[in-house]
């Protein structure tokens, strides 16, 4: 895999608070190699290591995007949800930012059935068919459509399993990480100082609680994806 320059610099990461970890009492000893110091009861992540792994992740997604591969970005906690959606939309990736439904990937046939139902309901609403139903029936279907939009809206165009999954919070999205491991789908994961760096294919040590930190990491990754997509289009 060719190494490229992704303009990842330490001052920018420091300004975004990427280096701030959890309290020293709430940590995973396996994160020791990625921690550079303790400050006021908080672990500080080694940003040189963060930059290295983020650069590797950017190289990986660039290469995948340049070959037309698909991506899924997962981050359902409140601080990550908006950044996940905007980053995914910008790079034309699928995303889950509300709730991970168990079996979303490992039981893909069920997910596919839900997606077909979701698309059918959206089509009926767009054609005005729901407004012709009795009020009670229309209200029930609109509630169902709203729920499907919340949970499946980010994957409504997904027609098969993703080639790479990017996960914002390892602890919060552990179920998604497990499903990827079962299916052999490569994962890129933001890991804070309370995480296990061995669970993802590429683990990026970073603050997964600060919006600015999450946004910075995602911006670098989706920029690399977009560059890869341009390369793919140019080579077709």
Swiss-Prot record:
The keyword Transferase does not apply. It holds the Pfam family Ribosomal_S2. CDD domains: RPS2. GO terms for cellular component: chloroplast; mitochondrial small ribosomal subunit. InterPro entries: Ribosomal_uS2 (IPR001865), Ribosomal_uS2_bac/mit/plastid (IPR005706), Ribosomal_uS2_CS (IPR018130), Ribosomal_uS2_flav_dom_sf (IPR023591). Keywords: Chloroplast, Plastid, Ribonucleoprotein, Ribosomal protein. Belongs to the universal ribosomal protein uS2 family. This is Small ribosomal subunit protein uS2c.
């Amino acid at each position: 895999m060719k190494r490229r320059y992704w303009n990842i610099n330490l001052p920018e990461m420091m300004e975004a608070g990427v280096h701030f970890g959890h309290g020293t009492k709430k940590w995973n000893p396996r994160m020791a190699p990625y921690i550079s110091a303790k400050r006021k009861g908080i672990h500080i992540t080694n940003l040189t290591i963060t930059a290295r792994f983020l650069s590797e992740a950017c190289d990986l997604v660039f290469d995948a995007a340049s070959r037309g591969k698909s991506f899924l970005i997962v981050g359902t906690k409140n601080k990550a949800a908006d950044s996940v959606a905007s980053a995914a939309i910008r790079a034309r990736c699928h995303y889950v930012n509300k709730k991970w439904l168990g079996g979303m990937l490992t039981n893909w046939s069920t997910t596919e059935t839900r997606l077909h139902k979701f698309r059918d309901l959206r089509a009926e609403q767009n054609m005005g068919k729901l407004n012709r139903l009795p009020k009670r029936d229309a209200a029930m279907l609109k509630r169902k459509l709203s729920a499907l939009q919340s949970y499946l809206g980010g994957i409504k165009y997904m027609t098969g399993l993703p080639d790479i999954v990017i996960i914002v919070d390892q602890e919060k999205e552990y179920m998604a990480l497990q499903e990827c491991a079962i299916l052999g789908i490569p994962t890129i994961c933001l890991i804070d100082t309370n995480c296990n760096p061995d669970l993802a294919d590429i683990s990026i040590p970073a603050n997964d609680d600060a919006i600015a930190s999450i946004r910075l990491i995602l911006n670098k990754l989706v920029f690399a994806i977009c560059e890869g997509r341009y390369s793919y289009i140019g080579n077709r």
